[in-house]
Design a protein with these regions (language model features):
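Active-site phosphate/pyrophosphate-handling residues
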Residues: 99, 183, 230
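Residue-level detector of anion-binding/catalytic polar loops
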Residues: 81, 119, 136, 241, ...
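Conserved donor sugar-nucleotide recognition element shared by glycan-biosynthetic enzymes
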Residues: 93-97, 228
Length: 309
């Protein structure tokens, strides 16, 4: 994905609302590093997101927990309805995603399935702008659990980009933070890779019609694809598009081995990356990202204007 040039920040002359505050008035000027996010609150009120979180061992990170607290408060303020489903102690992630999908499909009132993994940290506006985009499949961007940062996404030449440059079509992206419309699964039923499977893990029998392999591993072009890569490819096989919002840069929490060998390897990797990009080592943190750096803060502007088609 293209790396856009950073904008020159403006010097504020008036106070700016704190991060995450919902306002019906546009800010006159923003602090350096701030960004104003506009969403159509009337449209958002017609949606009902069903958040699904696989959490092996019944655990989630502090960053993820705090994200849900802020999300709940924001939805209460905006009047947005949402539901949530978790799944614990399922070590097979593909079966966990398929089971959560079956529960979502059984919940007829929900319009969107939102996968949020238990190690992803996010802000309320991240999900709001993804909903506001009204795309069939759209994700946020999060790094793999490695340093230097490598993003869990695959782009391609000639990809479509939204008029304002915030959305970009990709070939594959991770399901760790992915929003999917309900009718996507109805269309995926026509894909030969979507097969029913037996409910043999003690789930309610009413879920049986929805127990299908929407998320499964596969070998394509001699490559072993994970369940999220396969989902994206199957959807694109049917003519669907996968999008990411380049503003939605997330936190991915993991463990790290603190020793001199790891540090030495990190320095070597950063040096090689700096050489490839023609940058000084001290500047490589910003140049390594394939997308614009995230806003430090965001003010959500709740608008009632109709979304342009």
């Amino acid at each position: 994905m293209a790396n856009p040039q950073p904008e020159t920040p403006t010097t504020p002359t008036t106070p700016t609302p704190p991060a995450g505050q919902i306002t019906d008035q546009p800010a006159q000027q923003l602090q350096p590093g701030q960004q104003q996010i506009q969403v159509n609150v009337d449209y958002l009120k017609t949606t009902r997101v069903h958040i699904c979180m696989p959490c092996y061992g019944g655990m989630l990170t502090e960053s993820t927990f705090m994200s849900y607290i802020k999300w709940s408060n924001t939805c209460r303020q905006l009047g947005i309805d949402w539901t949530m489903e978790t799944m614990t102690n399922e070590s097979l992630i593909s079966r966990a995603r398929n089971t959560l999908t079956a529960k979502f499909l059984h919940n007829k009132e929900s319009t969107h399935l939102m996968f949020v993994d238990a190690d992803i940290g996010w802000e309320p506006w991240h999900l709001l702008v993804m909903l506001n985009a009204q795309k069939d499949v759209i994700g946020g961007l999060y790094p793999m659990k490695s340093l230097p940062v490598k993003w869990c996404v695959n782009g391609f030449d000639g990809a479509e980009v939204s008029e304002d440059g915030t959305l970009q079509e990709v070939s594959k992206t991770g399901t760790g933070f992915m929003l999917i419309k309900r009718d996507v699964f109805e269309k995926l039923n026509a894909h030969p890779a979507t097969k029913p499977f037996m409910n043999d893990i003690g789930l309610p029998v009413e879920l049986n019609p929805h127990m299908k392999t929407y998320f499964d591993t596969a070998v394509r072009e001699n490559r072993y694809y994970s369940e999220d890569w396969t989902f994206c490819e199957n959807w694109r096989d049917l003519g669907g598009k996968v999008w990411v919002d380049k503003r939605v840069l997330l936190r991915h929490t993991g463990t790290y081995v603190f020793d001199f060998q790891t540090q030495d390897q990190l320095y070597k990797d950063l040096h090689n990356l700096a050489v490839q990009n023609g940058q000084a080592l001290g500047n490589i943190v910003t140049s390594a990202a394939p997308v614009a750096q995230p806003p430090v803060e965001a003010t959500v502007l709740a608008s009632s204007k109709k979304k342009k088609k």
